[in-house]
């Protein structure tokens, strides 16, 4: 069981690296697409790949797993819509840090949902996270921009998703079945929103197409399968801590790709 936990944590580390690159991919996709359209293509591609590869298992999915996938997919859709909307108004470096503040929120969200009081060190971590958020976001007028505000909101929503996944997913559940209905639910919701907005078909350029492919194949199909599998064999707080490393990879990759300036407040 210990070896399985180590493997699960290594998988989550790979997920963090993939998600780190996802900040750049998201920015690329937004060059010609709006946030909901990006999510529609992303989740549709992820669900399609999952359905093709694991159809023999998916067609045997019990109703209980479908319900869990729908719940997680709805939370995921809301969170990522908020995240991409925020990315339109802030830098990838800013968002890569702010979106991973969920590592400090998870113990408190668990407290609310599971009635488990966090350890004292969780309160210290929460205070440090707030200080970091303040250094990154606050300007001289002590106000926070809309992009940074939405990024912080996403970190709270994703913290809820981590706790809910830990609550609903046990070691006996088929993660491929769960992931398909999670992605399928998010794809359907985003498609319906695009229908209302009149943005079902959008024009792509090379940059946005590469961004969508990265998000659909790696960030969605590969990473969410990895997350759902690994969280069966490790603790919620450990999972949150490892996945928060996406901020490090996201920041470093954004500095390399966009030549963003490293300032003292990030360090």
Where are the predicted features?
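Glycine-/small-residue-enriched transmembrane alpha-helix faces in small-molecule transporters
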Residues: 1-37, 74, 82, 142-167
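Juxtamembrane helix-entry segments on the extracytoplasmic side of multipass membrane proteins
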Residues: 4-8, 32-36, 40, 61-66, ...
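Specific transmembrane alpha-helical segments of multi-pass solute transporters/efflux pumps
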Residues: 18, 22-23, 51-99, 135, ...
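Transmembrane alpha-helical segments that form core, pore/gating elements
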Residues: 24, 47-50, 106-108, 112, ...
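Hydrophobic/aromatic residues within transmembrane alpha-helices
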Residues: 29, 38, 42, 86, ...
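Helix-helix packing/entry segments at the starts of transmembrane helices
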Residues: 40-41, 81, 95-101, 165-187, ...
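C-terminal transmembrane-helix exit sites in multi-pass transporters
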Residues: 49-58, 83, 102-124, 248-266
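Hydrophobic transmembrane alpha-helices of multi-pass small-molecule transport proteins
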Residues: 50, 70, 118-138, 158, ...
């Amino acid at each position: 069981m210990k070896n399985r936990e180590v493997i699960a944590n290594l998988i989550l580390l790979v997920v963090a690296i993939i998600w780190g690159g996802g900040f750049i991919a998201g920015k690329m996709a937004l060059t010609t697409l709006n946030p909901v359209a990006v999510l529609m293509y992303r989740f549709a591609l992820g669900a399609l790949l999952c359905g093709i590869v694991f159809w023999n298992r998916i067609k045997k999915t019990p109703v209980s797993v479908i319900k869990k996938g729908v719940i997680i997919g709805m939370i995921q859709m809301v969170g990522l819509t908020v995240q991409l909307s925020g990315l339109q108004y802030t830098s990838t470096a800013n968002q890569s840090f702010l979106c991973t503040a969920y590592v400090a929120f998870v113990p408190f969200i668990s407290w609310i949902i599971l009635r488990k009081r966090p350890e004292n060190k969780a309160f210290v971590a929460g205070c440090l996270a707030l200080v970091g958020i303040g250094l990154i976001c606050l300007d001289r007028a002590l106000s926070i921009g809309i992009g940074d505000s939405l990024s912080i909101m996403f970190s709270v929503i994703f913290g809820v998703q981590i706790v809910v996944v830990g609550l609903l997913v046990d070691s006996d559940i088929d993660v491929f079945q769960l992931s398909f209905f999670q992605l399928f639910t998010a794809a359907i919701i985003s498609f319906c929103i695009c229908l209302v907005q009149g943005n079902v078909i959008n024009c792509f350029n090379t940059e946005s197409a590469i961004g969508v492919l990265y998000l659909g194949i790696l960030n969605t199909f590969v990473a969410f399968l990895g997350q759902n599998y690994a969280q069966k064999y490790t603790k919620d707080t450990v999972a949150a801590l490892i996945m928060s490393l996406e901020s490090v990879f996201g920041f470093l990759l954004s500095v390399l790709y966009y030549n963003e300036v490293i300032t003292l407040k990030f360090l």
